[in-house]
């Protein structure tokens, strides 16, 4: 197929076909300037925002929770993808010439798949954690060590999935330019290439979103559709509201990811249906737009955290306190709110099955941090996102529920 826009260095599914020596995809300067400004916004916002998210969590002891460790992994993957791939993708799509050599050609085809896999499965892990915390609150939670092991396994699987595309990546020198492409093994009807691309799309988009959708649907029904007992205390209502805020924030994160990446996946599946589309000159603008939307997903999460979570908002205000239009706020609250451990007796209503479990509680907080004080063996440590530590002693009386702000 001649005159195909060479997408072979793009994130993943490539059209590994013959490319012409001429370059028909030449844009006017004003278009390049506009696209450059749009992509610059992504890189700056994503890298700065995600680095601040990582700092907020790792620099504050009480923010080191199971959920937040997965958010660190998500932020790391997105910051790296924005820093190492967005600009290169843009320059190659605009000029249709590969300037970066063989090694970076392999890395450029390899790393984004791994980063995208790590991102979506970090969201899946958070959804599973929310599901277990709210639907099965008496089940043991992941420890800090187990959480790190899960993150390590996610990256190992991500690297294995991305390996074939990096391995078969190569550069090809033409009389007028160099292109980065993927030379898949010869096979009738490009079977290996099609199988790999479909497998990748399912594993890093459709499958995890299906799992996440199921988890949050069940959690949403539990938190919003079930009635709260009329005699529940104000503290208990606050606790349920806190759970809802966490779930709502993560649903926004996942929906943003799904919307941003859908056009990109569709774009790379279309050639298997109608290959002639890649012969059209307008396809370059379609690609730049779909890639911008996909890459922009890396910059939205820090904004979502800042808008929907009080602690992250405090952290961002402190990080940007040098800006004259930003008030630093009560920065001590980032630590203080999660360090209060009050002994109280609390009623826990299991709304999913309309059962009430009455327990003695020592210290209610968002999640038990990595190195936080441990509850006594006879206590049930309930958190504002529904998490719990077992070894409980059931009581026959209830009292107010003390809930902290969310992490």
Curated annotation (Swiss-Prot):
Its main location: membrane. GO terms for molecular function: substance P receptor activity. Disulfide bonds join 105-180. SMART domains: 7TM_GPCR_Srsx. Residues 55-64, 129-148, 220-248, 309-407 are cytoplasmic. Keywords: Cell membrane, Disulfide bond, G-protein coupled receptor, Glycoprotein, Lipoprotein, Membrane, Palmitate, Receptor, Transducer, Transmembrane, Transmembrane helix. The chain crosses the membrane at residues 32-54, 65-86, 107-128, 149-169, 195-219, 249-270, 284-308. InterPro entries: GPCR_Rhodpsn (IPR000276), GPCR_Rhodpsn_7TM (IPR017452), Neurokn_rcpt (IPR001681), NK1_rcpt (IPR000046). Glycans are attached at residues 14, 18. The keyword Cell division does not apply. PROSITE patterns: G_PROTEIN_RECEP_F1_1, G_PROTEIN_RECEP_F1_2. One of its GO terms (biological process) is positive regulation of synaptic transmission, cholinergic. This is a receptor for the tachykinin neuropeptide substance P. It is probably associated with G proteins that activate a phosphatidylinositol-calcium second messenger system. The rank order of affinity of this receptor to tachykinins is: substance P > substance K > neuromedin-K. This is Substance-P receptor. It comes from Rattus norvegicus.
